[in-house]
Amino acid sequence: SDASEPAPACVVMYESWRYTTAANNCADTVSVSVAYQDGATGPCATLPPGAVTTVGEGYLGEHGHPDHLALCPSS
């Protein structure tokens, strides 16, 4: 299947009305994208350990609420 696997639990997603943010609490660098409840996925973002970054629109955006963070395929 084309469905990407969920990001590990040590990558935490925070949502607000404006942004969806990911925090990497893992020991390794991870590349994640937001999977929205409507089936859309956002662009991939690479987070080194300890990084916190905006990974997509918040719940007032085009795709509504994020569902989870998904791992991006390794290039």
Swiss-Prot record:
GO molecular function per UniProt: alpha-amylase inhibitor activity
Classification via Pfam families: A_amylase_inhib
Keyword Cytoplasm: no
Keyword terms: Alpha-amylase inhibitor, Disulfide bond
Transmembrane residue ranges: none
SUPFAM superfamilies from the UniProt entry: alpha-Amylase inhibitor tendamistat
Cystine residue pairs: 10-26, 44-72
Superkingdom classification of source: Bacteria
Protein's job: Inhibits mammalian alpha-amylases specifically but has no action on plant and microbial alpha-amylases.
Name assigned to this protein: Alpha-amylase inhibitor Paim-2
Species of origin: Streptomyces olivaceoviridis
